[in-house]
From Swiss-Prot:
Reactions catalysed: L,L-cystathionine + H2O = L-homocysteine + pyruvate + NH4(+); an S-substituted L-cysteine + H2O = a thiol + pyruvate + NH4(+)
Name of encoding gene: metC
Endoplasmic reticulum among keywords: no
Family classification: Belongs to the trans-sulfuration enzymes family.
Function text: The enzymatic degradation of amino acids in cheese is believed to generate aroma compounds and therefore to be essential for flavor development. Cystathionine beta-lyase (CBL) can convert cystathionine to homocysteine but is also able to catalyze an alpha, gamma elimination. With methionine as a substrate, it produces volatile sulfur compounds which are important for flavor formation in Gouda cheese.
Protein name in the entry: Cystathionine beta-lyase
Lineage of producing organism: Bacteria, Bacillati, Bacillota, Bacilli, Lactobacillales
Domain of life: Bacteria
């Protein structure tokens, strides 16, 4: 079996079949010459298919163990297409601490189509089992989750879903296929914001989807073409280039994050740390079972919640910005940034406090990052 370290470089369509180019060319075209009337070649129109995009789609399917991949103009575009598989009256079980954009899409957009949902703490399998209705068609979750780094048992949840004839939809953005393989654990569809670790350089907005079912692939392909939120060739090329160094980057992100999380856990200025690599994390054992390392994301709370503003503004190497997964370190406050679309009462109920801080730990020298955090904590 080929190692994923090799697959990120050689997987999918790694060379151009026409010219032999080692880097897949950017086919910057909207349409394609046909052989004759009613005689199209492999590609007809770039919304329906583009060679550069197709190479990326083949790559994500290869990395995740899917039968077909799909590249979208953003992570949310991919989520929208997947959730468009469902119809009025269908019920979705949604993890209670999903990304704010996913919650907004479900709560403000998809409910208008008649889809219904319930927010459920999926770390409690009894709560999950109790949440099923006759109309339940799918379970949707992230693991690790954004921003509380909750680790959910993909194998157990997938088995429960199958017992209820429901699909398991896993957002694998935080872990990437390098650290975690949801399809191998029973998931039906895997989604990514490729803007994050797959792209890896904060220079592209993209979404990727893959599935282990030919039937689902056919339906998703129809929706991708019909909705039209496809990824352009330039951006497809950028994501492919980013994936080539995924193994190197994820190992560096994970190593740096582990050391920072361990430091934060010992700091008197910090009251709580959320990182799956810590023995104190409630999902640590599950993470060890289904992940090869623990990733580059950390969330934590300061002992003095009033010190949050000073802390985030006193850092030198952690840029205050939304998004995550680039080579540079970022910091944000979910309650007023990435998760502001979730009502305050609901945010607090699920544990996203106003003072929660989220770090996207980059690949800089660990001594510089630790010094930066220590000095900012002392200045606050």
């Amino acid at each position: 079996m080929t190692s994923i370290k090799t697959k990120v470089i050689h997987g999918g369509i790694s060379t151009d079949k026409t010219t032999g180019a080692v880097s897949v060319p950017i086919y910057q075209t909207s349409t394609y010459k046909q052989n004759g009337l009613g005689q199209p070649k492999e590609y007809e129109y770039s919304r329906s298919g583009n060679p550069t995009r197709h190479a990326l789609e083949e790559l994500i399917a290869d990395l995740e163990g899917g039968v077909q991949g799909f590249a979208f103009s953003s992570g949310l575009a991919g989520i929208h297409a997947v959730l468009s598989l469902f119809s009025a009256g269908d019920h979705i079980i949604l993890a209670d601490d999903v990304y704010g954009g996913t919650f907004r899409l479900m709560d403000k957009v998809l409910t208008k189509t008649g889809i219904i949902y319930d927010l459920v703490d999926l770390s409690n399998l009894d709560d999950l089992k109790a949440a099923f209705k006759e109309e339940t068609k799918a379970i949707y979750f992230e693991t690790p989750s954004n921003p509380l780094l909750k680790v959910l048992d993909i194998k157990e949840i997938s088995a429960i879903a199958k017992a209820h004839d429901a699909l398991t939809l896993v957002d694998n953005t935080f872990a990437t296929p390098y650290l975690q393989q949801p399809i191998a654990l029973g998931a039906d569809i895997v989604l990514h914001s490729a803007t994050k670790y797959l792209g890896g350089h904060s220079d592209v907005v993209a979404g990727l989807v893959t599935t282990n079912s030919k039937e689902l692939a056919s339906e998703i392909g129809f929706l991708q073409n019909s909705i039209g939120a496809v990824l352009g060739p330039q951006d497809s090329w950028l994501v492919q280039r980013g994936i080539k160094t995924l193994a190197l980057r994820m190992e560096a992100h994970s190593a740096n994050a582990q050391k920072i999380a361990e430091f934060l856990e010992t700091s008197k200025a910090v009251s709580k740390v959320y990182y799956p690599g810590l023995n104190s994390h409630p999902g640590h054992e599950i993470a060890k079972k289904q992940m090869s390392a623990f990733g580059g994301m950390i969330s934590f709370e300061l002992t003095d919640e009033n010190a949050v503003k000073d802390f985030v503004e006193n850092l030198s190497y952690f840029t205050l910005a939304e998004s995550l997964g680039g080579v540079e370190s970022l910091i944000e406050v979910p309650a007023v940034m990435t998760h502001a679309s979730i009502p305050k009462e609901l945010r607090e109920e699920i544990g996203i406090k106003d003072g929660l801080i989220r770090l996207s730990v980059g690949v800089e020298a660990i001594e510089d990052l630790l010094t930066d955090i220590k000095e900012a904590l002392e200045k606050k």
